[in-house]
Amino acid sequence: MKKIIKLLIISIIVSCGGTQETKDEVKTGYATEGFWERVGTIQIVNGVNVDTIYWDDLELETRPRQVKAYAGKHFAWLSNAGVNQPLNEDHPWKTGAGAFGTYTFDPESTNQDNMVESLTNNIGGSHLWGEGWQNLSKDNPLPVRFAATVTDKNYTQLAVRNVESDSIFGVDERTIGNTPEYAEYYEKIDETQATKIDGTWKHIANVRYINGVAVDTIGVPDGLDDHKIFHKGNVMVNFDFTKAKKGDPNWGGAGLSGKFTYKDNLLVETFNLSTGNWRATGGVWPPTPYDIEWIDDDSFVQIWKVVARQGENGELEFVENESKETNGLLHIRVK
C-alpha cells in the first residue's frame, strides 16, 4: 500500500504542477522563525514609539487572540477577533480570520517594508476584506508589506495606514511620518526540541484503514488547500476550501493553533485557539492522539485513534474508536 500511496503523491504533485525542492534548495529560516502571540499594539508618532497598549490591560469581555507562525519560508496567522461589522449572512465566520503563504524578511534593509508576506490562502473574515483578498491563490498571491523588527523574545510589524481608506494592508508613502501609526506587538511562544515532524505540510489525500491495514486512498476534494505548520512543539492549521460558497458548511474554511508532542510515531495535538468551522467551546480542543505512518521523510499519514463527536453538553469531545475502520490524512512536505 505504501507504493500505491507514493504513486498517488507523485501523480498529485504532477497534476497540480507543483515541484519539490531538494533539501539543499530550501532556504534557512529567518530570525522570525517560530510562533508568536500578539500581546498588544505600539502607537508610533513621527517615527517615535509613544505608547504600548497591552491587551491584558484592556477591559474587554473577551480577550482576542492572534498567533503568527514562521517556519522556513512559509508563514501562517490566525485570529479569533470579532468581525468589525454587524453580524449577517455575508460573514463566513462569526469571529476571526487567518492566512497562509510565503514570506521574505531582510532585517538589514533600509526600505520602509523589509518584510513581504505573499498570501496564497485565507480563511474566515478576511474573505471580505476586498477584491485582492477574495481572489488570491498560489498563482495570484497577495503581497502584504511590513516594517518588521525582531529579537529573541519580541516581534513587531508595522503596515503604514492609507489615509484615504484607513487600510493597514497597503503602504502609502504620503502617510509615512505624517500620521499616527500602529504596530502589532508579539511575544515568542515557548518552544521544545525540534522533531522529525517539524516543517510545513499539505494534506493531499485521505486513507481508509480496516484492522490497521490501508485499503483505499482518495485525493482531497478539488479546491481544498489544507496546510499545517509544526515547529518545536507548536502547531497551526489553515484549512481553506477555496470553492466553498455561502451556504456550504466549509465556507470560509477553518483555523487551529496550539501545542503538540511527537515521539515514537505518536502525535498528540492540543489546540488552544480554534475558530471558524472547527470552533470548540472556549476555543480549546481536548488533547487528540494520532498514529503517524511515515511513507518517506517528506510524506506521512496522520491516523485517527479516536472519533470526534458532539457530547451531551453540546461541546466537542473525542472517544475511543471501537470500529474496525479508521481514517488517515496523507501529508506531503511543502518546501
Which residues are covered by each model-predicted region?
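C-terminal motif of bacterial Sec signal peptides marking the signal peptidase cleavage site
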Residues: 12-15
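Sec-dependent signal peptide recognition
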Residues: 2-10
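Compositionally biased, low-complexity segments enriched in small residues
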Residues: 1-2, 206
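Lipid interaction determinants
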Residues: 19-104, 108-259, 263-335
